[in-house]
């Protein structure tokens, strides 16, 4: 069965940033289905693909194709087929779009891996034309919340995560857009620019209604 022509949107953020509320707002848009977190599950698929790709180029293909070689057959790793099949796997098991879904994706708070840039570049290979929505929040409020407040001070860790995802957003150009929780909670109209970036009409009444409902419960 041919894969559907879907657009993809990924929310890039950190824990306790209000991203569940943002997910709720995005899902008010007709045809949008943005899933919640998956504990960075796709990163394991990235590591599989990148490992196989690197090992398939570990030496001359003539030697790697010899049945006496320890890595016999690895040179035949079909990189493009791997990308297609990973896209199908993620679509069928993680995203699970509805019949009327036009844009799908997920929000994730675990973007702190050291290979962040390489991982996102790979996501763009798996999901061509994917876009990335970066969500931030006032650090003082984040650090007071839940596990951020437990144990030793985590302010430097939070600052480093935000610095990296903002640098990522800048490197992605028009494929990325930034929103700030404190701005759109204070005034939902602050999200108008996000809707314009998405190419979708801004329904202020629906956004306000959604934001009046408690999320992340």
Segments (PLM) and residue ranges:
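Domain-wide signal for the mature, well-folded portions of proteins, strongly enriched
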Residues: 91-97
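PAPS-dependent sulfotransferase catalytic core
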Residues: 1-89, 204-206, 210-217
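PAPS-dependent sulfotransferase catalytic domain
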Residues: 47, 51-60, 97-204
């Amino acid at each position: 069965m041919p894969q559907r022509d879907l657009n993809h949107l990924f929310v890039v953020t950190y824990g306790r940033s209000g991203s569940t509320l943002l997910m709720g707002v995005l899902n008010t848009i007709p045809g949008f289905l943005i899933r919640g977190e998956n504990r960075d599950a796709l990163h394991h698929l990235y590591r599989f693909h990148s490992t196989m790709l690197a090992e398939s180029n570990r030496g001359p293909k003539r030697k790697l194709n010899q049945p006496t070689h320890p890595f016999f057959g690895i040179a035949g790793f079909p990189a493009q087929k791997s990308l297609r099949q990973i896209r199908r796997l993620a679509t069928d098991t993680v995203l699970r779009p509805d019949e009327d879904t036009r844009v799908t994706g997920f929000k994730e708070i675990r973007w702190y891996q050291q290979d962040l840039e390489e991982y996102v570049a790979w996501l763009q290979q798996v999901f061509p034309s994917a876009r990335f929505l970066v969500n931030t929040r006032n650090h003082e409020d984040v650090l007071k919340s839940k596990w951020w407040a437990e144990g030793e001070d985590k302010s430097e860790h939070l600052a480093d995560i935000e610095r990296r995802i903002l640098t990522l957003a800048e490197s992605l150009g028009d494929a990325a857009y930034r929103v700030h929780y404190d701005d759109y909670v204070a005034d939902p109209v602050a999200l108008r620019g996000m809707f314009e970036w998405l190419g979708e009409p801004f329904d202020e009444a629906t956004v306000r209604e959604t934001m009046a409902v408690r999320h992340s419960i």
